[in-house]
């Protein structure tokens, strides 16, 4: 392999890696992973208008973000989302970020444009 071929393949590998790494923060559905500190600022500024807790009822009853709406991933529907404007910022959260991402993607699938999620539990944004 000559130097030009090596650099070509190294560049391609780097681009592919960077692309996949970026998907962690920007999914194809239009949702976005944000830090807890950014979420706090966006809630305070009004950029995020709704906080949706997608955890189970047991987890919700144990504690939740003040003013959050309880909507587990399996009950997210167009009907349940009717009270939200499709241009409002929505933040989903759970305990680890996995269900929050699934919930965010489900909400975005109903045409919501500004849907964010965080890794970690609600207490990280208190």
Where are these regions (language model features)?
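Conserved beta-strand scaffold positions in the cores of enzyme catalytic domains, especially
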Residues: 51, 68-70, 115-117
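Flexible, polar/low-complexity N-terminal or interdomain linker segments that lie immediately upstream
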Residues: 1-50, 54-62
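Catalytic cysteine-centered active loop of the rhodanese-like fold, especially the PTP/DSP P-loop
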Residues: 77, 81-126
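A broad detector of short, well-ordered amphipathic alpha-helices
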Residues: 37, 66, 98-102
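Short, structured coil segments at secondary-structure junctions
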Residues: 64-66, 111
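Non-transmembrane, membrane-adjacent beta-strand/coil modules in membrane-associated proteins
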Residues: 73-74
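Short histidine-centered beta-strand/loop micro-motifs
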Residues: 61-63, 81-82
């Amino acid at each position: 392999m000559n130097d030009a071929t090596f650099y070509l393949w190294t560049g391609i590998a780097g681009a592919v890696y960077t692309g996949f790494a970026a998907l962690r923060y920007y999914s194809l559905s239009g949702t976005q992973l944000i830090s807890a500190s950014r979420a706090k600022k966006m809630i305070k500024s009004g950029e995020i208008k709704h906080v949706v807790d997608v955890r189970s009822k047991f987890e919700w009853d144990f504690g939740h973000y003040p003013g959050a709406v309880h909507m587990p991933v399996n009950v997210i529907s167009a009907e349940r989302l009717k009270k939200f404007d499709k241009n409002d910022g929505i933040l989903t959260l759970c305990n680890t970020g996995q269900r929050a991402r699934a919930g965010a993607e489900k909400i975005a699938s109903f045409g919501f444009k500004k849907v964010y999620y965080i890794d970690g539990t609600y207490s990280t944004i208190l």
